[in-house]
Each structure stands twice: as structure tokens, then as C-alpha cells.
């Protein structure tokens, strides 16, 4: 059961094994990076980078850091290199920054920390450069706000190649799969061909609804996958052997209760707002009162999708709890039956 649980986690997060031949992903080639940085293919094609491969070590570090922040946003940097149209992220480290529930910014103290940390890494023979930054969006999905877009655009201007990664720790706990997204911004004078690509359906809190999608034309998303080395595989097995019982005993409905309550409160606010809007529209339509507008139908459809999403997560948590109860609650009585 322990091995199958670990395998399920790796499959959910698409963690691929890297054998000794493919452990070369961890070997930094300084000459190759200098050649790529000199050629700068991303200058000719703003959508040059299309993939991100994140090591299991970096993924765990970023997820644990995001979770430790609670309702506050946290921030860190990623180390690695580029290979063709792919970012290879080998490691990540947190930054000592002050965050709020809606934004996070690096200060002078963080800049000094970055310089010292990278110097120590190079002294130990780790030559990977900083290739991006990550931060958390507790409870409101993986996308870029206006401040995030400006931050990423500035970094791409001065130290490209660079990418932004967003992790939602609340949705990660809720689903059991790391909720992660990777993004790059377009140049200021560039308009993507084929129009604006939407961020897709996400249950975004009402307070963030106005900003969600407002800057979608300024950035694009990259496909995220994960990998592990032979050493990572051994370390993950040791960690899983230590914590797998705790994983089984936890219930996301209890662990993430505050997030669930916030979702329900936010949904009720959206329903109230949609009801007010529909009533106002019908009152202004006069004789067309019986006909609902397309915008009203769209709003109701989004609310229905969000309600179904919340209900499915709650249902999954309840079913998982019932399965664990049926598996473990009667083990003692079956193993040691008592005679009357």
C-alpha cells in the first residue's frame, strides 16, 4: 500500500524517473549556456519557450514553502538552465520577503540574500544560474496579476531567460496534486497572433474576479512537467516510508477546512451579485422581461460550474474518508476476535 501510494503521487504530478544516462539533466554546461545566451533565440520569437521541467526536489521545496505561508503570499527563486525551448529547473530557494494576502515584493534584504546564496552555491561547485521566480496564490489559482506581469516583464528585460511560476497551496491540499503554472510575458509592443488566449475556467474569488484575465494578452503559459534523478528516487522512498501513514490519516476536508469555508462564502457572494444583476437587467428590459440575456446565462453557467467543482471536491473527500474507515476501523477486531 505504501509503494502504491507513492506511485499514485508521482503519477498525479507527472514525476518521471531519470536514469543514470538521463541524470545529465543535472550537469550544467557553462559553455552551452554562454552560446545560448549569445544567440538569444527568444528575442526573435517571444513564444520561443514552451516547456518547463522541474525537478522533484525543487517541486517539493516550492510546495512546502508555499504551504508554510498560509494565507500570505511567499516568494522564492529557481535555479537551472535552458535547453532548446525548455527551462530545466534543478533547485529552488526561498527568499526572506514580506508578503500579504494579495501581493509579495522583494526588498533590499532579499537582494543581499540572493547574492550571498548564489556565491555560496558556486563555492560548492553548483554553477546553475537563476532562471525564474516563484510565488504563491493561496486559494485563487495559478495566473498572473498586474503586479506579477510587471515583475516578470522587468526580470525578462534585464536578465532573460526568466520565467514566473505560481503555486496555489490551498488547491494543492484540496486535490492532492500540486496546483502549479508557469508563465512568460510578451514584449510591450508585441501582440500575440490568433488573439488573446484565456486563462481557462478557474474558480476565482470575487475579490480577484476583476483582475483575473485582465492581463491575459500580456503573457502566456508554458507546459509544466517534473522529473527525478536516481538519488531523488531513493530520497523520496525514504521520505514516503516515514510519512505515508500520516498522509493516509489526513483528511483534506479537515486540513483545508478554512479554504472550504472561504469557497462557500465566496460562492454565496457571487450568487447574490448575479441575482442582483439579473433582476436589474429584467427590470430594465420591460416587455422582454421573460428573456434572459446572454451575459446572464454566462454568469449563471459559471456559477453552476463553480458549485459543481466545490461539490465534487467535498464528495471526493467524503468518499476517501469512508474508504479509509472501512479499511482500517475493523482491523483490530478482525485480527483479534473476542470470544463471548
From Swiss-Prot:
SMART domains for the chain: JAB_MPN (SM00232)
EC number: 3.4.-.-
Matches recorded under Pfam families: CSN5_C (PF18323), JAB (PF01398)
Motif (JAMM motif): 135-148
Broad EC category: hydrolase
One Gene Ontology term from the biological process aspect of the record: proteolysis
Domain of life: Eukaryota
SUPFAM superfamilies xref list: JAB1/MPN domain
Gene3D superfamilies per the UniProt record, alphabetical: Cytidine Deaminase, domain 2 (3.40.140.10)
Binding site for Zn(2+): 135, 137, 148
Keywords: Cytoplasm, Hydrolase, Metal-binding, Metalloprotease, Nucleus, Protease, Signalosome, Zinc
Coiled-coil features, chain-numbered ranges: none
Example of a GO MF term: metallopeptidase activity
Domain annotation MPN: ranges: 52-189
Gene Ontology CC: one annotated term: COP9 signalosome
Location within or outside the cell: Cytoplasm; Nucleus
Its job: Catalytic Component of the COP9 signalosome (CSN) complex that acts as an regulator of the ubiquitin (Ubl) conjugation pathway by mediating the deneddylation of the cullin subunit of SCF-type E3 ubiquitin-protein ligase complexes.
Quaternary structure (record): Component of the COP9 signalosome (CSN) complex.
Family, as annotated: Belongs to the peptidase M67A family. CSN5 subfamily.
Domain-level remarks: The JAMM motif is essential for the protease activity of the CSN complex resulting in deneddylation of cullins. It constitutes the catalytic center of the complex.
Protein name, per record: COP9 signalosome complex subunit 5
Amino acid at each position: 500500500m505504501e509503494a502504491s501510494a507513492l506511485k499514485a503521487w508521482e503519477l498525479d504530478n507527472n514525476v518521471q524517473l531519470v536514469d543514470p544516462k538521463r541524470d545529465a539533466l543535472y550537469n550544467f554546461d557553462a559553455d552551452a549556456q554562454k552560446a545560448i545566451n549569445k544567440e538569444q533565440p527568444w528575442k526573435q520569437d517571444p513564444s520561443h519557450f514552451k516547456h518547463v521541467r522541474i525537478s522533484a526536489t525543487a517541486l517539493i521545496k516550492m510546495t512546502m514553502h508555499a504551504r508554510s505561508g498560509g494565507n500570505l503570499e511567499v516568494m522564492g527563486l529557481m535555479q537551472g538552465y535552458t535547453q532548446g525551448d525548455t527551462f530545466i529547473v534543478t533547485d529552488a530557494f526561498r527568499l526572506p520577503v514580506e508578503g500579504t494576502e494579495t501581493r509579495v515584493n522583494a526588498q533590499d534584504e532579499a537582494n543581499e540574500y540572493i547574492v550571498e546564496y548564489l556565491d555560496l552555491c558556486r563555492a560548492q561547485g553548483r554553477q546553475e544560474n537563476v532562471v525564474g521566480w516563484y510565488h504563491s496564490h493561496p486559494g485563487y489559482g495559478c495566473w498572473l496579476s498586474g503586479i506579477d506581469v510587471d515583475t516578470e516583464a522587468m526580470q525578462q528585460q534585464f536578465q532573460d531567460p526568466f520565467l514566473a511560476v505560481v503555486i496555489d497551496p490551498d488547491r494543492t491540499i484540496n486535490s492532492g496534486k500540486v496546483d502549479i503554472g508557469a508563465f512568460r510575458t510578451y514584449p510591450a509592443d508585441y501582440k500575440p497572433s490568433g488573439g488573446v488566449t484565456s486563462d481557462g475556467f478557474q474558480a476565482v474569488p470575487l475579490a480577484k474576479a476583476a483582475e483575473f484575465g485582465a492581463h491575459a494578452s500580456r503573457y502566456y503559459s508554458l507546459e509544466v512537467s517534473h522529473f527525478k534523478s536516481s538519488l531523488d528516487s531513493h530520497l523520496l522512498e525514504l521520505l514516503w516510508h516515514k510519512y505515508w501513514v500520516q498522509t493516509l490519516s489526513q483528511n483534506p476536508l479537515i486540513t483545508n477546512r478554512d479554504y472550504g469555508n472561504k469557497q462557500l462564502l465566496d460562492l454565496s457572494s457571487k450568487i447574490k451579485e448575479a441575482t442582483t444583476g439579473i433582476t436589474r437587467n429584467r427590470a430594465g428590459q420591460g416587455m422582454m422581461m421573460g428573456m434572459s440575456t446572454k451575459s446572464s446565462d454566462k454568469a449563471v453557467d459559471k456559477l453552476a460550474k463553480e458549485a459543481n467543482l466545490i461539490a465534487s471536491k467535498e464528495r471526493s473527500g467524503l468518499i476517501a474518508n469512508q474508504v479509509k474507515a472501512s479499511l482500517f476501523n475493523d482491523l483490530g477486531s478482525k485480527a483479534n476476535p473476542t470470544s463471548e
